[in-house]
């Protein structure tokens, strides 16, 4: 990853891209580029993450980061007969709230299946009348039914996705989403992603983290007021020994 970044930057100033290239030289050069604020070379370096067990609510937040590529599990073609859902920690910690939450999810599953079955029963004879075979009519009716039934599914519904971002976009993502003011689910995800990035390419992410780790808090009156503790926590994250293989 560092070599790719170095090649991208030196292409602007040299005829030969690979002359004298070494990991030590690349790391030093990346540090110099970061100090100078010259970030375009790191756009040539990308990381791809496989993410599971997150909610559709998180999906709505992460896809706001437009300099990224996303592939998300479809609710249009994947039927959620008994969907998995995410439970917020505050709800899980409250017995009465948790009971109400799980009851609501069970009712939602029942409503989803009832809607899907009813719509499928409506669409099936229509497709038969159009000349489809029984098998084709059944398949088309189910797909069309779950396409509309999915509207009843909650934000808590679990989804899976692949996300690819370049280093520059990731740094910005971490500034915003590792912040204490970010919603808990995407903050936890961003912190786990940062750990993986630091293990894979520490030189590229040595200063990555919430904005207060690079300077003052940009949140003004809405600051969490815990800047010292946040800086200490992310300093420990960066200091942790690497356990990942760099690919």
Identify the residue ranges that each predicted region occupies.
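Single conserved hydrophobic/aromatic residue that forms the stacking wall/gate
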Residues: 1-8
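Active-site loops and adjacent core secondary-structure elements that bind or stabilize anionic groups
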Residues: 11-12
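Short linear interaction motifs
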Residues: 23-33
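A glycine-rich, charged low-complexity "G-patch/RS-like" nucleic-acid-interacting patch
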Residues: 32-143, 152-155
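Generic secondary-structure signature for well-ordered alpha-helical cores
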Residues: 110, 114-117, 121, 154-158, ...
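Flexible, glycine/charged-enriched surface loops at secondary-structure junctions
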Residues: 126-128, 145-146, 203-209
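Long, amphipathic alpha-helical surface segments
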Residues: 163-247
């Amino acid at each position: 990853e560092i070599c790719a970044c170095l090649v991208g930057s030196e292409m602007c100033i040299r005829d030969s891209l690979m002359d004298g290239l070494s990991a030590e030289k690349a790391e030093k050069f990346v540090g110099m580029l970061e100090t100078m604020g010259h970030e375009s070379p790191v756009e040539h370096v990308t990381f791809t993450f496989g993410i599971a067990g997150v909610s559709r609510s998180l999906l709505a937040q992460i896809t706001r980061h437009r300099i990224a590529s996303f592939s998300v599990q479809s609710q249009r073609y994947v039927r959620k007969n008994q969907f998995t859902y995410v439970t917020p920690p505050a709800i899980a910690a409250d017995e009465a709230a948790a009971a109400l939450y799980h009851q609501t999810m069970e009712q939602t599953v029942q409503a989803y299946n009832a809607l899907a079955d009813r719509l499928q029963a409506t669409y099936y004879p229509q497709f038969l009348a159009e000349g489809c075979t029984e098998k084709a009519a059944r398949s088309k009716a189910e797909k069309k039914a779950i396409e509309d039934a999915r509207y009843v599914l909650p934000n808590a519904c679990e989804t899976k996705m692949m996300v690819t971002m370049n280093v520059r976009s990731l740094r910005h993502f971490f500034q915003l989403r590792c912040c204490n003011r970010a919603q808990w689910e995407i903050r936890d995800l961003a912190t786990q992603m940062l750990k993986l990035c630091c293990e894979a390419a520490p030189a590229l992410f040595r200063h990555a983290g919430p904005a207060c780790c690079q300077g003052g808090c940009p949140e003004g009156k809405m600051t969490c007021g815990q800047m010292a503790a946040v800086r200490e926590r992310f300093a420990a994250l960066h200091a942790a020994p690497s356990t990942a293989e760099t690919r």
